[in-house]
Amino acid sequence: MSAFRDQRGFTVAEVLIAAAIVAVAFVALGRIVPIAGYAVQEGYQGSTATFLADQKLELIKDLPWVSTPANDCLGISASATAAPNVPAGATCTLGATTVNGGNALPWEANENTTAITNFNGYSRQVRVTDCGSGAGCMGIVDAGMRLVTVTVSYTPLTGVGVATAPKSYFVSMLISQQ
Protein backbone atom coordinates (compact mmCIF):
# COMPACT_ATOMS: atom_id res chain seq x y z
CA MET A 1 0.00 0.00 0.00
CA SER A 2 2.82 2.38 0.66
CA ALA A 3 3.68 2.38 -3.06
CA PHE A 4 0.40 4.14 -3.81
CA ARG A 5 1.08 6.86 -1.30
CA ASP A 6 4.39 7.83 -2.92
CA GLN A 7 2.87 8.52 -6.34
CA ARG A 8 1.97 12.14 -6.85
CA GLY A 9 -0.26 13.72 -9.52
CA PHE A 10 -1.51 17.16 -10.28
CA THR A 11 -3.50 18.95 -7.67
CA VAL A 12 -6.78 20.65 -8.51
CA ALA A 13 -5.10 24.05 -8.09
CA GLU A 14 -2.37 23.17 -10.60
CA VAL A 15 -4.94 21.98 -13.15
CA LEU A 16 -6.95 25.20 -12.76
CA ILE A 17 -3.86 27.37 -13.26
CA ALA A 18 -2.88 25.43 -16.41
CA ALA A 19 -6.44 25.74 -17.75
CA ALA A 20 -6.39 29.50 -17.17
CA ILE A 21 -3.08 29.86 -19.04
CA VAL A 22 -4.40 27.82 -21.98
CA ALA A 23 -7.63 29.88 -22.03
CA VAL A 24 -5.65 33.16 -22.18
CA ALA A 25 -3.59 31.77 -25.06
CA PHE A 26 -6.73 30.78 -27.00
CA VAL A 27 -8.30 34.22 -26.45
CA ALA A 28 -5.14 35.90 -27.76
CA LEU A 29 -5.09 33.58 -30.76
CA GLY A 30 -8.76 34.31 -31.41
CA ARG A 31 -7.99 38.03 -31.60
CA ILE A 32 -5.05 37.57 -33.98
CA VAL A 33 -6.78 35.37 -36.57
CA PRO A 34 -9.11 38.10 -37.97
CA ILE A 35 -6.19 40.53 -38.23
CA ALA A 36 -4.12 37.94 -40.09
CA GLY A 37 -7.05 37.31 -42.44
CA TYR A 38 -7.32 41.06 -43.08
CA ALA A 39 -3.59 41.25 -43.87
CA VAL A 40 -3.86 38.41 -46.39
CA GLN A 41 -6.88 40.09 -48.04
CA GLU A 42 -5.12 43.46 -48.18
CA GLY A 43 -2.12 41.87 -49.85
CA TYR A 44 -4.36 40.13 -52.37
CA GLN A 45 -6.27 43.32 -53.21
CA GLY A 46 -3.08 45.39 -53.50
CA SER A 47 -1.46 42.81 -55.78
CA THR A 48 -4.59 42.65 -57.93
CA ALA A 49 -4.74 46.44 -58.24
CA THR A 50 -1.08 46.59 -59.29
CA PHE A 51 -1.65 43.78 -61.80
CA LEU A 52 -4.62 45.61 -63.35
CA ALA A 53 -2.61 48.84 -63.64
CA ASP A 54 0.33 47.03 -65.25
CA GLN A 55 -2.02 45.18 -67.60
CA LYS A 56 -3.42 48.49 -68.91
CA LEU A 57 0.08 50.01 -69.26
CA GLU A 58 1.16 47.02 -71.35
CA LEU A 59 -1.75 47.67 -73.70
CA ILE A 60 -1.07 51.41 -73.85
CA LYS A 61 2.66 51.22 -74.53
CA ASP A 62 1.95 49.36 -77.79
CA LEU A 63 -0.44 52.03 -79.11
CA PRO A 64 0.78 53.94 -82.18
CA TRP A 65 1.91 57.54 -81.66
CA VAL A 66 3.90 58.57 -84.71
CA SER A 67 4.43 61.88 -86.48
CA THR A 68 4.80 60.52 -90.03
CA PRO A 69 2.23 59.50 -91.04
CA ALA A 70 0.40 61.34 -88.25
CA ASN A 71 -1.31 58.78 -86.03
CA ASP A 72 -1.98 59.53 -82.34
CA CYS A 73 -3.75 56.69 -80.54
CA LEU A 74 -2.19 57.58 -77.17
CA GLY A 75 -4.10 60.84 -76.79
CA ILE A 76 -3.91 63.55 -74.14
CA SER A 77 -6.09 64.16 -71.07
CA ALA A 78 -7.60 67.65 -71.03
CA SER A 79 -7.43 67.66 -67.21
CA ALA A 80 -6.53 65.41 -64.29
CA THR A 81 -10.14 64.18 -64.20
CA ALA A 82 -10.63 63.55 -67.94
CA ALA A 83 -9.88 60.40 -69.92
CA PRO A 84 -7.57 60.93 -72.93
CA ASN A 85 -8.89 62.18 -76.28
CA VAL A 86 -7.23 62.33 -79.68
CA PRO A 87 -5.63 65.81 -79.87
CA ALA A 88 -7.40 68.38 -82.05
CA GLY A 89 -6.19 68.24 -85.64
CA ALA A 90 -4.97 64.64 -85.29
CA THR A 91 -6.53 61.24 -85.94
CA CYS A 92 -6.06 57.75 -84.58
CA THR A 93 -6.19 54.63 -86.70
CA LEU A 94 -5.81 51.34 -84.86
CA GLY A 95 -6.76 48.32 -86.91
CA ALA A 96 -10.27 48.89 -88.25
CA THR A 97 -10.99 51.66 -85.71
CA THR A 98 -10.54 55.33 -86.63
CA VAL A 99 -11.04 58.08 -84.04
CA ASN A 100 -11.06 61.73 -85.11
CA GLY A 101 -9.48 64.61 -83.19
CA GLY A 102 -11.24 65.67 -79.99
CA ASN A 103 -12.96 62.30 -79.55
CA ALA A 104 -12.45 59.80 -76.75
CA LEU A 105 -10.23 56.77 -77.16
CA PRO A 106 -12.30 53.71 -76.20
CA TRP A 107 -9.32 51.66 -74.93
CA GLU A 108 -8.42 54.42 -72.45
CA ALA A 109 -11.94 55.13 -71.16
CA ASN A 110 -12.67 55.07 -67.43
CA GLU A 111 -13.72 51.61 -66.26
CA ASN A 112 -16.11 51.45 -63.30
CA THR A 113 -16.31 48.69 -60.68
CA THR A 114 -18.23 46.31 -62.97
CA ALA A 115 -16.42 47.01 -66.26
CA ILE A 116 -13.23 44.98 -65.78
CA THR A 117 -14.01 41.35 -66.64
CA ASN A 118 -13.45 38.97 -63.69
CA PHE A 119 -12.43 41.84 -61.40
CA ASN A 120 -15.66 43.29 -60.00
CA GLY A 121 -15.04 45.90 -57.34
CA TYR A 122 -12.01 47.41 -59.09
CA SER A 123 -12.16 50.59 -61.16
CA ARG A 124 -9.45 51.84 -63.51
CA GLN A 125 -8.58 55.26 -64.96
CA VAL A 126 -5.99 56.31 -67.51
CA ARG A 127 -4.57 59.83 -67.64
CA VAL A 128 -2.07 61.05 -70.24
CA THR A 129 -0.09 64.25 -69.64
CA ASP A 130 1.67 66.13 -72.45
CA CYS A 131 5.29 66.63 -71.35
CA GLY A 132 5.78 69.42 -73.90
CA SER A 133 3.61 71.96 -72.10
CA GLY A 134 3.82 73.73 -68.77
CA ALA A 135 6.32 72.30 -66.31
CA GLY A 136 6.54 69.07 -68.28
CA CYS A 137 6.64 65.66 -66.62
CA MET A 138 8.96 64.89 -63.72
CA GLY A 139 11.30 67.67 -64.84
CA ILE A 140 11.24 66.67 -68.53
CA VAL A 141 9.89 69.23 -71.00
CA ASP A 142 9.66 67.51 -74.38
CA ALA A 143 6.76 67.50 -76.86
CA GLY A 144 7.80 64.00 -77.92
CA MET A 145 7.11 62.56 -74.43
CA ARG A 146 3.92 61.84 -72.52
CA LEU A 147 3.37 60.64 -68.98
CA VAL A 148 0.78 57.86 -68.72
CA THR A 149 -0.68 57.20 -65.27
CA VAL A 150 -3.03 54.28 -64.62
CA THR A 151 -4.92 54.39 -61.32
CA VAL A 152 -6.80 51.37 -59.96
CA SER A 153 -9.18 51.86 -57.03
CA TYR A 154 -11.08 49.44 -54.81
CA THR A 155 -12.80 49.43 -51.43
CA PRO A 156 -10.58 47.48 -49.04
CA LEU A 157 -11.53 45.40 -46.04
CA THR A 158 -10.43 46.45 -42.58
CA GLY A 159 -9.98 44.41 -39.44
CA VAL A 160 -13.66 45.09 -38.60
CA GLY A 161 -15.39 45.20 -42.01
CA VAL A 162 -15.38 47.21 -45.22
CA ALA A 163 -13.53 50.55 -45.29
CA THR A 164 -15.50 53.76 -45.81
CA ALA A 165 -13.16 55.16 -48.46
CA PRO A 166 -11.61 53.55 -51.54
CA LYS A 167 -7.91 52.82 -51.76
CA SER A 168 -5.94 53.51 -54.94
CA TYR A 169 -2.75 52.25 -56.53
CA PHE A 170 -1.18 53.98 -59.48
CA VAL A 171 1.55 53.12 -61.95
CA SER A 172 3.16 55.69 -64.27
CA MET A 173 5.30 55.41 -67.38
CA LEU A 174 6.91 57.90 -69.74
CA ILE A 175 6.21 57.10 -73.39
CA SER A 176 8.08 58.66 -76.28
CA GLN A 177 6.78 59.33 -79.75
CA GLN A 178 7.80 56.62 -82.21
Predicted regions and their residues:
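Low-complexity, Gly/Pro-rich coil/beta segments used as flexible assembly/activation regions
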Residues: S47-Q178
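N-terminal leader/signal peptides at the extreme start of proteins
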Residues: M1-F10
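Aliphatic-rich helix starts adjacent to a transmembrane/signal segment
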Residues: F10-D54
